[in-house]
């Protein structure tokens, strides 16, 4: 099975894989090279998850803005 890029995964799948990696790393039975690969993957997953959360927070802020007369516009995460 091919490993998905973190940015192409759902937030829930990202958290699930990250949780699994943490369990494996905490177990301590991995060779150093395997542990380092899993750590690098975990960092990529954590960063992707943080990006997804930031995007969601921005969308919620837009929806809850106090200006009821403001026109709605599409959210574009690349604009930041």
UniProtKB/Swiss-Prot annotation:
Molecular function terms, GO-annotated: exodeoxyribonuclease VII activity
Family matches, as Pfam families: Exonuc_VII_S (PF02609)
GO process annotations (BP): DNA catabolic process
Keyword Cytoplasm: yes
Reactions the enzyme catalyzes: Exonucleolytic cleavage in either 5'- to 3'- or 3'- to 5'-direction to yield nucleoside 5'-phosphates
Main location: cytoplasm
Enzyme Commission number: 3.1.11.6
GO annotation, cellular component aspect: cytosol; exodeoxyribonuclease VII complex
Keywords associated with the record: Cytoplasm, Exonuclease, Hydrolase, Nuclease
Positions of disulphide bridges: none
Principal EC category: hydrolase
Subcellular location: Cytoplasm
UniProt family annotation: Belongs to the XseB family.
Entry-linked NCBIfam families: PRK00977.1-1 (NF002137), PRK00977.1-4 (NF002140), xseB (TIGR01280)
Assembly with partners or alone: Heterooligomer composed of large and small subunits.
HAMAP family: Exonuc_7_S
Function: Bidirectionally degrades single-stranded DNA into large acid-insoluble oligonucleotides, which are then degraded further into small acid-soluble oligonucleotides.
Name the UniProt record assigns to this protein: Exodeoxyribonuclease 7 small subunit
Organism the protein comes from: Vibrio campbellii (strain ATCC BAA-1116)
Gene designation per UniProt: xseB
